[in-house]
UniProtKB/Swiss-Prot annotation:
It is an enzyme of class 2 (transferase). The gene is pyrB. It catalyses: carbamoyl phosphate + L-aspartate = N-carbamoyl-L-aspartate + phosphate + H(+). Carbamoyl phosphate binds at R49, T50, R99, H127, Q130, G251, P252. Pfam families: OTCace, OTCace_N. GO terms for molecular function: amino acid binding; aspartate carbamoyltransferase activity. Coiled coil: none annotated. This is Aspartate carbamoyltransferase catalytic subunit. Catalyzes the condensation of carbamoyl phosphate and aspartate to form carbamoyl aspartate and inorganic phosphate, the committed step in the de novo pyrimidine nucleotide biosynthesis pathway. One of its GO terms (biological process) is 'de novo' pyrimidine nucleobase biosynthetic process. Heterododecamer (2C3:3R2) of six catalytic PyrB chains organized as two trimers (C3), and six regulatory PyrI chains organized as three dimers (R2).
Length: 295
């Protein structure tokens, strides 16, 4: 049984096949590949973009979607994760998409469910479809010429599952990664590190990936206010100037904290393209896992 728990679950050949399929899906036309199939979404953490993206992807493939309301589910009343898995399995879905605040939950569910499980984000651990859509966006922009491209990841890297998945995936495709964050947001890593964002770093980057500060994952207050953080790490036109690059963000964007209003409206900022690409990538992932499982 194939699952997508981390980006490591797909090899490079499979990822390139996903990109080819996703490129076809960018026309937004409805398909019938998953007609008669059922996909269950169960998000134990709040989500608007990822949940909507997966559900749009499923419906465009012709599948039915069952969204489980966790706030009213038995899990909120003390049901164990194993019982939740057993009950989900008893509904005989063709795939389950799960998000959870605790790292490792999608993997635990995958061991007790007889259909593909897709990780929609677990704790600080992984967010594989976000990393895939980010690389897909980069790949399309540079027309496949991504090896050696310099990417600067800025923000709360230590607490970001998006950063964790991107670092694994982008390293495999030989992008040159630099991390920029305050010391308390910086993970232990062999990658190049800077503790302040400046013009020289941006001048040497082809891609900037800004991240949201994960205040809900902080055990203590790090900054008196997010404005203090923004003074050092907000992506602003005065820093970027006319540099030829692209700016990415997984969303939601804290305007004037992560990225300035001016840069959000800049044509180099591809946040909305990431959203569009996300639906196409998730279509490709769901189609691959479900049809391979039944083949």
């Amino acid at each position: 049984m194939r699952h997508l728990i981390t980006t490591k679950d797909f090899n490079k050949v499979e990822i390139m096949e996903l990109f080819k399929e996703a490129s076809d899906f960018l026309d937004e036309k409805p398909r019938t590949f998953l007609k008669g199939k059922s996909i269950t979404t169960i998000f134990f953490e709040n989500s608007t973009r990822t949940l909507s993206s997966f559900e749009s992807a499923a419906r465009r493939l012709g599948a039915r979607v069952l969204r489980l309301d966790v706030s009213r589910s038995s899990s909120s009343k003390g049901e164990t994760l194993y019982d939740t898995a057993a009950n989900l399995d008893a509904m005989s879905p063709n795939a389950i998409v799960v998000r959870h605040a605790n790292s490792g939950v999608p993997l635990i569910l995958a061991k007790h469910i007889h259909c593909p499980v897709v990780n929609g984000g677990d704790g600080k651990h992984a967010h594989p479809t976000q990393a895939l859509l980010d690389l897909f966006t980069i790949y399309n922009h540079f027309q496949g010429d991504v090896e050696g491209k310099k990417i600067c990841i800025v923000g709360d890297i230590k607490n970001s599952r998006v950063a964790a998945s991107n670092i694994e995936l982008l390293s495999r495709f030989n992008l040159d990664i630099t991390l920029v964050a305050p010391p308390h947001f910086m993970p232990n890593t062999h990658l190049k590190k800077h503790y302040k964002l400046d013009e020289n770093i941006i001048a040497n980057s082809d891609i900037i990936m800004s991240l949201r500060t994960q205040t809900e994952r902080h055990n203590k207050t790090v900054y008196a206010s997010l404005k203090d953080y923004a003074n050092d790490f907000c992506i602003q036109k005065s820093l970027v100037k006319d540099k030829k690059l692209i700016l990415l963000h997984p969303g939601p964007v804290n305007r004037n904290i992560d990225i300035s209003d001016e840069m959000m409206s800049d044509e180099r900022t591809l946040v909305l393209k990431q959203v569009k690409n996300g639906v196409a990538i998730r279509m490709a992932v769901l189609k691959k896992l479900i049809l391979e499982n039944e083949g």
